[in-house]
Swiss-Prot record:
InterPro entries: Dynein_regulator_LIS1, G-protein_beta_WD-40_rep, LIS1_N, LisH, PAC1-like_LisH-like_dom, WD40/YVTN_repeat-like_dom_sf, WD40_repeat_CS, WD40_repeat_dom_sf. Residues 72-95 are annotated as: Disordered. Residues 54-80 form a coiled coil. GO terms for biological process: cell division; establishment of mitotic spindle orientation; microtubule organizing center organization; microtubule sliding; nuclear migration; vesicle transport along microtubule. GO terms for molecular function: dynein complex binding; microtubule plus-end binding. One of its GO terms (cellular component) is microtubule associated complex. This is Lissencephaly-1 homolog. It comes from the Eukaryota. WD repeats lie at residues 104-145, 146-187, 188-229, 231-269, 272-332, 335-374, 377-409. It comes from Nematostella vectensis (Starlet sea anemone). The keyword Repressor does not apply. Residues 7-39 form the LisH domain. Belongs to the WD repeat LIS1/nudF family. Positively regulates the activity of the minus-end directed microtubule motor protein dynein. May enhance dynein-mediated microtubule sliding by targeting dynein to the microtubule plus end. Required for several dynein- and microtubule-dependent processes.
Amino acid sequence: MVLTPRQKEELNKAIADYLHQCGFEDTLNAFKQDANMPGELDKKYTGLLEKKWTSVIRLQKKVMDLETRLSEAEKEVHHGGGPKKTRSPEDWIPRPPERYTLTGHRSPITKVLFHPVYSVMVTSSEDATVKVWDYETGDFERTLKGHTDAVQDLAFDHTGKFLASSSADMTIKLWDFQGFECIRTLHGHDHNVSSISFLPSGDHLVSASRDKTIKMWEIATGYCVKTFQGHGEWVRRVRPNADGSLIASCSNDQTIRVWVVASRECKCDLRDHDHVIEDLNWAPESATPVINEAAGVEGGKKAMSPGPFLVSASRDKSIKIWDVSAGVCLVTLVGHDNWVRAVMFHPGGKFIVSCSDDKTLRIWDYKNKRCAKTLVAHEHFVTTLDFHKSAPFVATGSVDLTLKVWECR
């Protein structure tokens, strides 16, 4: 491509300005003489060369992203024997490459969570901060500071007005997500608070800790109103079911316990993992028929189970689906090459998504007990993931300090 005389003149002036800004005066004078540029430098060309350079890099990255997407689409068309029908939202799964790679945390990311209403997400980190990001534009919005040690988990109430954070500093903080102020700090655990969740009603929180207990907190007063004891080691995660009548917890003691909130009684004790259980989540109603189908294939069962069902992820590299009412493991998914750090059901119910220390994000067709897609997601351990409940996005966070947003289609 040949530059026009005007473009050449502008390029020369931009180069001259760059040499001047860098203090290369001898080179500048020689260049001005060779390029026949007498007189003072024009201020309108200040910084132009750097701007052009960064624009080229940005465009080059976009071109590479588009080429990767085109290649992915061509592969799908080739393997599918022709253009596929548009997938319905329950079939959407994350596709490479990532839409955004976001940086800002100074230590490993421990949790990523989409806001239930706004187009923002929050992350927590071992750097003791919580950060807010716009997942549609990739813009960083703000940092919430207050904890004095690693922030381990985050939770929104169903309205999205309140955010709760739990930390290795042994506290839980409640944030007004409209004013971004800490409105209450809850004290009571004797060790690292590894997990936090709002009950669906929004008036109570449940937390899990390395002190081996689970606590329930009244939000209006900040008081601990119940303590659940029974795990023999660090309680890693606690999650309430859809109506808030049950809570499930998993632990370093390799068990999952399901508790009746009203009575604090342990309804069942699920054992089949043979290492620390890192994460668990309840199955949505949309998953019930698929789970029954998967269990029928595996166990030859015909009777439909109403559930409820759980999915768990462990350092034994496996993912398990559990029938809480029967107290049994229905399905085991194997394929990760290292600890599985986070797991959840796809909102449509057909898939399970997981992330691992093997640096991958995996999508499981659990009805057929196979991994449907593997994405090499990060350059280090992938510690956390979230699947947006209604928009086609998945977010992942890693020990490599990056947060990635993946589009689903």
